[in-house]
Regions:
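Fe(II)/2-oxoglutarate oxygenase catalytic core
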Residues: 1-148, 152-178
Length: 178
């Protein structure tokens, strides 16, 4: 599926002081049980604000996906030489309503590139990313910037070359595509 507007960027939409508070609380939440990382964020007001922006992007970009709810938001701290391989979110089941599917994904940058971390570029791709069919490489995302994209797009983070990148990610969910 080719989209005229495959993503939406909302620069510095979340204030710096709120980003700092989320980082502080997120660092306290990260737990590792040896099998998986547990780092769910449950800020109701934050999820409402993000859901509103995501729903507006859904409409304004002409995606018009039916969404019913949001899945959990996850806080992540990506450290030195860590990265995310190419992935897409619509292949995994939502943790809250596994009978639904992830429809729209988002990533909120909580700290500042070239001050708090270096590298760790966010990249989006159509289809098989190894064909280098990139949509965009976001290498200068300011603190508080939100990127919204359909969950069937591939995305990744390149390696962190210094510092720690802090983000929140999540999905709006809905019925499976017909």
């Amino acid at each position: 599926m080719h989209l005229e507007y495959p993503y939406s960027v909302h620069h510095s939409i979340i204030p710096d002081n709120l980003c700092d508070e989320i980082i502080e609380q997120g660092e306290k939440l990260i737990k590792w049980d040896g099998l998986e990382r547990r780092s769910g964020i449950t800020h109701g007001f934050l999820m409402k604000a993000i859901s509103s922006i995501v729903n507006t992007a859904n409409e304004n970009n002409g995606w018009n996906y039916v969404t019913e709810n949001h899945d959990r938001m996850y806080y992540q701290s990506i450290g030195w030489h860590q990265y995310h391989k190419w992935r897409m979110n619509n292949k995994s089941k939502p943790s809250i309503n596994p009978e639904k599917m992830n429809k729209i994904s988002f990533m909120l940058s909580l700290n500042q590139v070239d001050i708090d971390y270096h590298g760790c570029y966010f990249e989006l791709a159509y289809g098989a990313p190894w064909t280098q069919n990139y949509l965009n490489r976001f290498d200068e995302l300011k603190k508080g910037t939100l990127i919204v994209f359909p969950s069937f797009l591939y995305y990744r983070f390149s390696p962190v070359m210094g510092g720690d990148r802090k983000i929140i990610s999540g999905n709006l969910i809905g019925p499976a595509f017909a």
